[in-house]
């Protein structure tokens, strides 16, 4: 290992956050992001070429970089990775060899949100629900967007963390009212199994709106989640009621997840939906519904704080933190933590 270059000693690394359409890249120096740029995946046959072009654009030499961490949408195992929403794939050995890397780390894209939560400052968070976070307990990260991402962050002491990715978006959707049940029945007719993600996602918000209109005998006026949100913000009563129902369902799912992982360190909300409708979310019944349950479980959650993550590039930040910890672990233990 060349300690003059690797991220564990304040050197230079490359960080990427790769989605279906765009790849965001940054340099990671001294545990900070620099030179952030967004490239279209369709413009490059292979991710290695996108990395080379990014470095050329920011005037940095590949020779100065020996570590790369890429956040990838989908389950990340030990083998090769194929992106589900674009034409790219990564053969770890070939990627390292072509770019001359000592270290390559691939992480799940939602896991980076959990890594980011370990590093965010007060100016990158908006409090939804007051409380007293316990520093030595787990934190929950939940984010409705294209799907419903769920993960947790465990403190290990001495500034070290463990991220536990999961598939919590696929738990059963909780039903607590007659209205919930009516919506759930319609969702079951559409999909069979009704997971939390069937409501708590972009497609889920649209489905909730369509079903609610059908139940109330009101014409459908939106064809996308963005249009539902726009109608709600413009004062449409039906769309606003649907958005409120969405936020209440998020409160129940988040509360259940917090109980499951013991998230007394707090709950962090991310994803593409809640930050977009932040003011409406803050005015919703989320804060009360989060801990509104039986006597014992309600008391357990009563002092758990909830925040919205507002950092501009949490995926890149989280990937940088993940790489930093992996390199530090290698240096400390001598056991390789990267490919």
From Swiss-Prot:
ATP binds at residues 16-21. It comes from the Bacteria. Its main location: cytoplasm. This is Glucokinase. Its EC number is 2.7.1.2. The gene is glk. It catalyses: D-glucose + ATP = D-glucose 6-phosphate + ADP + H(+). Belongs to the bacterial glucokinase family. It is found in: Cytoplasm. InterPro entries: ATPase_NBD (IPR043129), Bacterial_glucokinase (IPR050201), Glucokinase (IPR003836). It is an enzyme of class 2 (transferase). The keyword Kinase applies.
């Amino acid at each position: 290992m060349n300690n003059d270059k690797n991220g564990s000693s304040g050197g230079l690394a490359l960080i990427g956050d790769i989605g279906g359409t765009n790849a965001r890249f940054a340099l990671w120096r001294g545990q900070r992001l620099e030179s952030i740029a967004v490239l279209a995946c369709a413009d490059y046959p292979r991710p290695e070429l996108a990395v080379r072009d990014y470095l050329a654009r920011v005037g940095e030499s590949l020779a100065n970089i020996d570590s790369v961490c890429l956040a990838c949408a989908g389950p990340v195992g030990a083998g090769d990775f194929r992106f589900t929403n674009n034409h790219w794939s990564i053969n770890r050995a070939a990627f390292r060899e072509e770019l001359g890397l000592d270290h390559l780390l691939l992480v799940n894209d939602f896991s980076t949100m959990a890594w980011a939560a370990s590093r965010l400052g007060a100016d990158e968070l908006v409090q939804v629900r007051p409380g007293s976070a316990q520093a030595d307990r787990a934190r929950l990260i939940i984010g409705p967007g294209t799907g419903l991402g769920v993960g947790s962050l465990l403190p290990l002491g001495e500034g070290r963390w463990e991220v536990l990715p999961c598939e919590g978006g696929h738990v059963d959707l909780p039903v607590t009212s007659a209205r919930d049940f009516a919506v759930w029945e319609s969702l079951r007719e559409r999909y069979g199994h009704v997971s939390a993600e069937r409501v708590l996602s972009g497609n889920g918000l649209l489905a909730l709106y369509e079903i609610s209109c059908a139940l109330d005998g009101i014409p459908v006026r939106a064809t996308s989640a963005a249009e539902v949100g726009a109608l709600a913000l413009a004062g449409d009563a039906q769309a606003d009621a649907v958005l409120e129902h969405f936020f209440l369902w998020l409160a129940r799912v988040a509360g259940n997840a917090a109980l499951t992982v013991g998230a007394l360190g707090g709950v962090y909300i991310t994803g593409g939906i809640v930050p977009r409708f932040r003011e409406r979310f803050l005015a919703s019944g989320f804060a009360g519904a989060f801990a509104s349950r039986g006597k014992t479980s309600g008391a357990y959650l009563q002092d758990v704080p909830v925040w919205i993550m507002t950092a501009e590039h949490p995926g890149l930040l989280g990937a940088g933190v993940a790489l930093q910890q992996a390199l530090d672990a290698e240096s400390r233990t001598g056991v390789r933590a990267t490919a």
